[in-house]
Curated annotation (Swiss-Prot):
<keyword id="KW-0810">Translation regulation</keyword>
<keyword id="KW-0496">Mitochondrion</keyword>
<dbReference type="GO" id="GO:0005743">
    <property type="term" value="C:mitochondrial inner membrane"/>
</dbReference>
<dbReference type="GO" id="GO:0006417">
    <property type="term" value="P:regulation of translation"/>
</dbReference>
<keyword id="KW-0472">Membrane</keyword>
<dbReference type="GO" id="GO:0006397">
    <property type="term" value="P:mRNA processing"/>
</dbReference>
<protein>
    <recommendedName>
        <fullName>Protein PET54</fullName>
    </recommendedName>
</protein>
<comment type="function">
    <text>Activator of specific mitochondrial mRNAs. PET54 is involved in the excision of intron aI5-beta from pre-mRNA for cytochrome c oxidase I (COX1) and plays a role in promoting the translation of COX3.</text>
</comment>
<dbReference type="InterPro" id="IPR035979">
    <property type="entry name" value="RBD_domain_sf"/>
</dbReference>
<dbReference type="InterPro" id="IPR003954">
    <property type="entry name" value="RRM_dom_euk"/>
</dbReference>
<keyword id="KW-0694">RNA-binding</keyword>
<dbReference type="GO" id="GO:0003723">
    <property type="term" value="F:RNA binding"/>
</dbReference>
<keyword id="KW-0010">Activator</keyword>
<keyword id="KW-0999">Mitochondrion inner membrane</keyword>
<keyword id="KW-0507">mRNA processing</keyword>
């Protein structure tokens, strides 16, 4: 009995002095990772083994953070506007860095991995608009994501200035940083919010309207810049970027022209005879407008 009590006493004294149980080995910093990086949270390991982003695929481009928060169990019986969210995250609508088109997916960026795991567990069997929610951890390293979002931010900023800056900037390199944290990524995303609210993408804009005379044609909107980002003359398809001086004009432009026939934009028919005359001359495709802030 005395021998066992001495052994127990020895274990307790060792645990009190070192904080480790007898027989354990101190963890060592892997080769290639500095002690400073390990003490600061080991970002390099975190980016690979502990993702901070959930990927959510959806064809609905109009989801907002409130939709994602609504499926938490605590909000099941609450009205919209009364939802609570103890697992804070930022909802990111993923867009193509070059043409700014919505890529049918959202990212949920969390502050820490534990919050990500908890949210995924709580919403595993949930539905949004009657569609089963399927979210998967994004294993892509944070610096790679940062590079993509920086590319998008830079291209949007250039497009907001002029077509010349946009096309020249497409070939510029983006410097990838090794050590990236969540707050840096948030800053990049926040930097484009205002520009997104003042920008629209327009498919099937009438080719008869050139960038030089669009400002005069739409004189009642305060347009900042307008140019074709993509065009296919054979298929009669084009994608135009238009930026405005204020977000209200961008919103009104989409509301007034989305779904309108191109021929009606150029020459609004007043009589049935006018309609018949324009059908054979002007493209009858519809304008599809996307407000980048939606």
């Amino acid at each position: 009995m005395k021998g066992s009590s001495k052994a127990i006493k020895r274990v307790l004294e060792h645990l009190q002095s070192t904080g480790r149980v007898l027989g354990t080995v101190e963890s060592k910093v892997p080769a290639g990772i500095s002690e400073e990086a390990a003490l600061s949270g080991g970002h390099q390991q975190l980016q690979i083994k502990k993702p901070l982003i959930l990927q959510f695929r959806s064809y609905n481009p109009y989801l907002v953070k409130e939709d994602i928060v609504s499926i938490l169990p605590e909000n099941q019986y609450k009205k919209r506007g009364q939802f609570t969210n103890g697992l804070d995250f930022q909802l990111i609508k993923v867009r193509d860095p070059k043409y700014f088109q919505f890529k049918d997916q959202y990212y949920l960026l969390f502050n820490d991995h534990n919050s990500l795991v908890e949210y995924a567990d709580l919403t595993r069997l949930s539905r949004i608009n009657k569609v089963r929610v399927r979210m998967t951890p994004l294993m892509q390293p944070l610096p790679n994501l940062m590079t993509k979002f920086q590319r998008y931010s830079q291209n949007l900023h250039n497009a907001f200035q002029s077509s010349e800056k946009y096309f020249e900037g497409l070939t510029e390199k983006i410097d990838a940083k090794n050590m990236i944290d969540v707050t840096q990524l948030w800053r990049v995303l926040d930097s484009v919010r205002e520009m997104e609210s003042k920008s629209v993408l327009v498919w099937n804009f009438p080719t008869e309207l050139q960038s030089s005379n669009i400002l005069n044609y739409f004189w009642f909107y305060n347009i900042r810049s307008s140019f074709k980002m993509y065009w296919d003359d054979e298929m009669k398809r084009n994608l135009r970027f238009i930026s405005f001086e204020n977000s209200n004009d961008a919103y009104r432009f989409k509301r007034n022209y989305h779904g309108l026939l191109a021929k009606e934009l150029l020459n609004p028919p007043r009589k049935e005879k006018d309609t018949l005359e324009t059908n054979s001359v002007i493209d009858d495709s519809k304008l599809l407008i996307e407000h980048l802030n939606e």
